[in-house]
């Protein structure tokens, strides 16, 4: 075992407001330690203290003299980690980081840096869980290095977990909602509707996925109450899979914060294929503050802006985390350019299915101009999709080589297929169904049960927010009725852009009684897990003889012939065009 010299005197450093690091009650020495040599490893900067045990998880978290990480809750044997916090698991909790080495990387008055290392024996993933405390910061930074040289399946998820004292932290916060979640111990006594879903005594439905949210909309999430808050801040989304439409479970009952740096609850990319067989996830910041409920949220919002402005972190000393970054700019030209979502990612694969590399995204302005800051050096494809209007075709421009402090791509032409006449359109092309009825509500599976089996939507009379729903979720017919002043010849195109599917739905599409397409999809679990706006995007451009349309009244029917429980199709937009 290597051990260096003691780099600080604990008493003097604490008095100066710096970081102290003690191992088994004595000033810590940098080096590698067997778990059996670690009884307690404590980091303290006067604002916060945290102690880790021999398995690499935390045994204590103290702010202002208050212990925040005791009385941890969960259901055993259902959750074998019910009494642990600050740890990593994967494959739906079926695998976890096992500490082979606890490394004290750096011990200075400015920083304590430790790493819990799993060498990957017995078919486990080789993992490094790095945890850092900086002087003057009431929180902990972290990152994970995962090695996967043989491209093994990650089982759909890998995450860091932060369990807190539920007696203190009885409120949950994500971008979409705040609320008091029930305790697992109470939930297991109730009627279970489906997995992780219960009927409450008042008849309402609670599902842990009610507290999912989009990473692109959620700069922080966590728990708070009784004078304290703990908020997880991703700081950057570059290391998450699936891009701007990636949504994940972030917090749930028993005061648990979940950082799914690999997650596919809604069909997004699992990210199994890492470049060179290794990927660094993070760094992130877990902020611990104090105050009343409103104060801790307001303070955390200010803090996350401060942390984002520091990116990339100059104190990071990892070859896998380049500090030299590039600002990539340009201007899209084309029908879908205004306010388009612009991304740099791998070529050849829809961004939502990516995860092994890094993804950068920003929304363009009204003129199509975009700026992507802090991009890692490398070769990317430029991807874009519309967030308004009628353009459903995506842009991909390959071989974008990023280097230097800035890269101006100039004008990027976005050529989209267009037809001579748009007869009608329902919704806007943004890969989401949020503009339709219930699409703006808080997540809950009750909404999919409230959509009608049959409806008639009349072009020119019906309203999207009132008469078209976020999803079609029952066997029945959704009819679009419209008048045409004339008959047509040639080719017509019905575009059905789908924001998500659940429950293996089957839909037969017909025009004036003539079937033109039968759709059948696999499950992305979006509506099943209370999503209201998106899952896996799909696009159908269905051509048919324009002669099927007549002068007078016409009907396009979306006939659902089969769907699983709480499943359905979420429509992004539906439009009819003539060549």
Task: Pin down the residues of each PLM region.
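Extended, loop-rich substrate-binding clefts of extracytoplasmic carbohydrate-active enzymes
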Residues: 81-147
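Acidic (Asp/Glu-rich), glycine- and aromatic
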Residues: 131-132, 136-183
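A short, amphipathic beta-strand motif
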Residues: 326-334, 368-370, 412
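Short, acidic Ser/Thr/Gly-rich low-complexity loop/linker segments typical of extracellular
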Residues: 350-369
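Structured interaction patches on ligand/partner-binding surfaces of diverse proteins
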Residues: 387-411, 415
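Beta-strand-rich ligand-recognition modules
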Residues: 475, 481-489, 497-579
